[in-house]
A protein has these predicted regions:
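N-terminal intrinsically disordered, cationic/polar leader segments
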Residues: 2-367
Length: 367
């Protein structure tokens, strides 16, 4: 009987080494990568076709009990706060860098003194100096969440912006909050109520310490072409021919800068201004008598896209809480295969020599 003794007091011969090597190769040839790594990763060199790695063997089991203490956190690399030598590309100031479309429930106050909790998409950005590599974007979210339990107003948005601007040591900053605001709307004749949803955005921009508060609203309405209406009436009158004018769903994006120190412009107030300017808002609850009333309402208010821009402007100019503004209107034609569009700006805030190439394509109903 042969007994293996670990304490061999002589050097193995070459023949013994060759036999041992052959045995290891036979075993390694049938073993898995995991089995080889468990025994000794260096054995990969003995197997034809297996890659040899000098990388240490790492655990593949998630460490549930591991806790990162202060010392460990301090040891973590932070490339975004690295030296200027890490900057890639031109060393230029970046006007806006941050995060977009992080969502959370936010509580908003209504004109009737109630609160609504609405899903809100938040964009937060700051300026970045030319000599800084980058920002820690999670700080924007953390700063915003610190205020998320409060009922939001522009004052709360200002506090959130100040928090992350200080945390990121930036000069300029911006917050935009997008949400759909529900408001009850009564039908034209049947007396039924339904919820109309309005896409709003609140924007706070601070540049060189000066805040600018902006409210955006997408208002959806029906536009009946005045020319088509007259042509239809001509066919009826002159030839006894039944004809109908073309009308279409239309969207106006109303952007208003709020006057500093002015009274609160409620969401409902801006909606009311739009309804006053263009009363042919699309309906929610509709019975036959409402549909007939809507046809009559459109006939009483035919409107070109140029008219729409000017009518909205006329209403906005009457409100002392509103400073500069912009109206972007899109009549999504039922006659033509293209849309009719217009842009009207008042004041320097929204004046621009160039338009976003995708601007008009974003004027759609719903999200």
């Amino acid at each position: 009987m042969n007994v293996f003794n670990r304490d061999i007091d002589r050097e193995p011969t070459r023949a013994e080494a060759e036999r041992a090597l052959a045995l290891l190769r036979d075993w390694a040839g049938a073993a898995s990568d995991g089995e080889i790594e468990t025994l000794d990763p260096a054995l990969s060199a003995l197997c034809p076709g297996r890659a040899v790695s000098d990388y240490p063997t790492l655990s593949r089991t998630y460490p549930d009990g591991f806790e990162a203490d202060a010392a460990y956190k301090a040891s973590l690399p932070d490339l975004q706060n690295g030296p200027a030598s890490l900057i890639r590309g031109a060393r230029r100031q970046i006007q806006h860098v941050g995060i977009s479309n992080f969502r959370l429930p936010i509580r908003f106050h209504t004109r009737e003194n109630g609160d609504l909790t609405l899903e809100t998409s938040v964009t937060g950005t700051v300026s970045l100096e030319a000599e800084k590599k980058g920002i820690n974007m999670s700080r924007i979210m953390r700063s915003f969440y610190a205020h998320a339990e409060r009922t939001f107003s522009f004052q709360v948005i200002e506090a959130a912006l100040a928090s992350y601007k200080a945390d990121l040591e930036s000069f300029d900053a911006r917050i935009m909050m997008c949400f759909s605001f529900p408001m009850k709307m009564r039908s034209l004749r049947s007396g039924l109520d339904g919820f109309q949803y309005y896409d709003f955005a609140l924007e706070l921009v601070e540049t060189a310490g000066v805040p600018l508060k902006i409210m955006h609203l997408d208002y959806v309405y029906s536009s009946t072409c005045p020319c088509s209406l007259e042509l239809s009436e001509h066919a009826r009158r002159e030839r006894g021919q039944l004809a109908t004018p073309h009308s279409q769903r239309s969207v106006a994006r109303i952007s208003v800068a709020l006057e500093p120190g002015g009274d609160c412009l409620w969401f409902e107030d801006l909606i009311d201004l739009c309804r006053k300017a263009v009363p042919t808002e699309t309906q929610v609850m509709v019975k036959r008598e409402d549909e007939q009333a809507f046809a009559e309402l459109n006939a009483a208010n035919p409107i070109f896209v140029e008219d729409a821009a000017r009518l909205f402007a006329e209403a906005l100019l009457t409100d002392p809480r509103i400073g500069d503004f912009r109206v972007v209107a899109s009549h999504q034609e039922s006659l033509h295969s293209h849309d009719a569009v217009s842009v009207l700006t008042e004041g320097a805030t929204f004046a621009a020599d160039s338009l976003d190439p995708k601007l008009f394509s974003t004027l759609v109903h719903g999200r």
